[in-house]
Design a protein with these regions (language model features):
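N-terminal Rossmann-like FAD-binding beta1-loop-alpha1 element of flavoenzymes
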Residues: 5-31
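Glycine-rich loop(s) and the adjacent beta-strand/alpha-helix scaffold that form part
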Residues: 190-245, 302, 387-404
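Core beta-strand elements of the Rossmann-like FAD/NAD(P) dinucleotide-binding domain
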Residues: 2-4, 181-190, 366
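Conserved N-terminal glycine-rich FAD pyrophosphate-binding loop of Rossmann-like flavoproteins
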Residues: 35-68, 247
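Conserved redox-cofactor binding core of oxidoreductases
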Residues: 92, 97-182, 187, 194, ...
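Short beta-strand to alpha-helix junction loop
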Residues: 77-87, 125-140, 155, 205-213, ...
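An anion/pyrophosphate-binding glycine-rich loop and adjacent beta-alpha core
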Residues: 218, 224-337, 404-411
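Glycine- and aromatic-enriched mobile tails/lids
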Residues: 1-5, 21, 25, 36-38, ...
Length: 581
């Protein structure tokens, strides 16, 4: 059985944190990443990390952080996991402080905090507007030190292909070197999947283009359960782009930025007018729906487009440069305007997946030996994630998955031995599948099919959903799934071939699109990011439950069931952000 090591797939915050904890527990790690760790999507998180540090003397507490998170997620998150995360948050921020992360500080030397959406307290520690990058770089340095000591073996530029499952237990992975195209089996006592979100399912999103969701999709295809797939966060303020959308952080509003458009020839600050208690810092699902209403229903978007203004030009330039320089420079680079002088034009965009692989309290999936951590799991955010809880949940999930994966590995029978033939068979199968894709010579273009799927999902399965469109989307996704077999591969090279991995990823993206769409179709209520005008209210009696998708190998379709939500710590109540809660 393995080598007394664990395979970690993903080099972002969750994967690196899990790696550190596994090595702390005395085991070695094989660490896989598509890109150099510092280029993982965690680097794109801008605004900060939440923790009830109370350095502002506002009386903030872990209890309030916990309540805000559960309330913001519309009570769909299992509460013990969220409570544990909020309790760990101050320790996590202090850990990064000791690692040398250059958090902004007050004149007194305390950690500075800013407000984020869905809160009444300043709770978000930040390093300018590049917080994710700074946290990622700190963990990268720690892992590099362990690599030098021989405790971590890194495989950068390798893509996860499949889990290896023997007698119902995960005992390793196969992965492909994207330069040589070699496929190898890697025995492991346990596997941690930490590969982020699935924004590419929607075509353009704020996610990095590597965020296809393939690893989670492949685990789902191999029997892992996928939970709450229908809950996709649409960020209210992104920079529209031809190639992809780019995030304009909530921190811009946290530092005093205002969202507005023209109405009757005058600036209209519609969020401040409708939600006086929270103003521009209402939760993201609410801000997005208000912007959608203003642009699509009231036709009040700027210059007739589906964009509004996000204005920070009234804030003194020295303050902007000290706290928001990173994101303002991004806007100036890609748009050409200086946001210090003119309002920014922003629009909602697919941003984050609250759903993901089903895991228990120990971050283990329903397949023994297979763990998941970070955005690719479903545990912390319910129906809507609060801003600045993403960095926290990624680190916390890695911090939980790592020790539990190590404990699982140590608990395996000493005489357990997986035959070499199991790994040889897994390698042979994935090699055969790779060769089969390489030989495809049909008339369909994989990139066109991906574009069609993305446009379909963005149109029908984002801000506003209705059952007729969702049913039609499912039919069209099934048509796309059928067309996959008729793809033609233009690049037949047997080295550095980007076409074949993309087609493999596309198979997974179509399956995840079906999970998301079917979950949305079946859930006849409105909750968090899931909004159906046909069913405008939250329905706890029928729908206070987690959606569980199981893959049907014959039809390639999800089979849905439901699981009770643990609401043992806070009784559900109606969300209302027109007043402080």
């Amino acid at each position: 059985m393995g080598k007394g090591s664990i395979a970690v797939v993903g080099g972002g915050l969750a994967g690196l944190m899990a790696t550190l904890k596994i090595v702390e527990a005395g085991l070695s790690v094989d660490l896989f990443s598509l890109v150099p760790f510092k280029r993982s999507h965690s680097a794109c998180a801008q605004g900060g990390i939440n923790a009830a540090l109370n350095t502002k003397g506002e009386g903030d507490s872990i209890d309030e952080h916990f309540d805000d998170t559960i309330y913001g997620g519309d009570f769909l998150a299992n509460q013990p996991q969220v409570r544990a995360m909020c309790e760990a948050a101050p320790k996590i921020v202090n850990m990064f402080d000791r690692m040398g992360v250059m958090f902004n500080r007050t004149p007194e030397g305390l950690l500075d905090l800013r407000r984020f959406g869905g809160t009444q307290k300043r709770r978000t520690a930040f390093a300018g507007a590049t917080t994710g990058q700074q946290l990622l770089y700190a963990l990268d340095e720690q892992v590099r030190a362990l690599e030098v000591e021989g405790k971590v073996r890194t495989y950068v530029g390798w893509e996860f292909v499949s889990t290896i499952i023997h007698n119902g237990v995960c005992c390793g992975i196969t992965a492909q070197d994207l330069s040589s195209m070699e496929i190898r089996a890697f025995p492991a006592d346990a596997v941690v999947i930490a590969t982020g979100g699935c924004g590419a399912v929607f075509g353009k999103s704020t996610n990095s283009t590597i965020n296809t969701g393939y690893a989670a999709a492949r685990c789902y295809q191999q029997g892992a359960l996928y939970a709450n797939g229908e809950f996709i966060q649409i960020h209210p303020t992104a920079i529209p782009g031809f190639d992809k959308n780019r995030l304009m952080s909530e921190s811009a509003r946290g530092e005093g930025g205002r969202v507005w458009t023209y109405k009757d020839g005058k600036p209209w600050y519609f969020l401040e007018e409708k939600y006086p208690a929270y103003g521009n810092l209402v939760p993201r699902d609410i801000a997005t729906r208000e912007i959608f209403d203003v642009c699509v229903n009231q036709h009040l978007g700027i210059n007739g487009q589906n964009v509004v203004y996000l204005d920070v030009s009234h804030i003194p330039a020295p303050v902007l440069n000290a706290k928001l320089e990173g994101i303002l420079d991004i806007y100036q680079k890609f748009v050409g305007d200086d946001p210090r002088k003119v309002p920014m034009r922003v629009a909602p965009s697919v941003h984050y997946s609250m759903g993901g692989l089903w895991v228990g309290l120990d971050q283990q999936t329903n397949i023994p030996g297979l763990f998941a951590a970070g955005e690719c799991d479903y545990t912390q955010h319910g129906a809507n994630r609060l801003g600045a809880n993403s960095l926290l949940s990624a680190v916390f999930a890695g911090m939980t998955a790592g020790p539990n994966a190590a404990a699982y590995a140590k608990g395996l029978p000493e005489d357990q031995n997986i035959p070499k033939s199991v790994y040889e068979a897994a390698t042979a199968k994935d090699e055969s599948d790779y060769r089969s894709i390489l030989k495809l010579d049909g008339a369909e273009n994989a990139y066109r099919l991906h574009q069609k799927m993305g446009e379909l999902m963005t149109k029908n399965v984002t801000v506003v959903r209705n059952n007729a469109d969702l049913a039609e989307t499912l039919v069209k996704l099934e048509e796309i799934d059928e067309r996959l077999s008729r793809i033609g591969v233009q690049d037949k090279a047997t080295w550095s071939n980007a076409n074949v991995p993309f087609i493999r990823q596309l198979y997974g993206m179509v399956d995840l699109a079906m999970v998301i769409t079917k979950g949305a179709l079946e859930r006849n209520e409105s909750r968090g990011s899931h909004f159906k005008p046909e069913f405008p209210d939250r329905n706890d009696e029928e729908w206070l439950k987690t959606t569980i998708a199981r893959y049907d190998t014959a039809s390639h379709s999800p089979v849905l069931s439901y699981e009770k939500v643990d609401t043992s710590l806070i009784a559900p109540r109606k969300r209302d952000y027109t007043k402080a809660h």
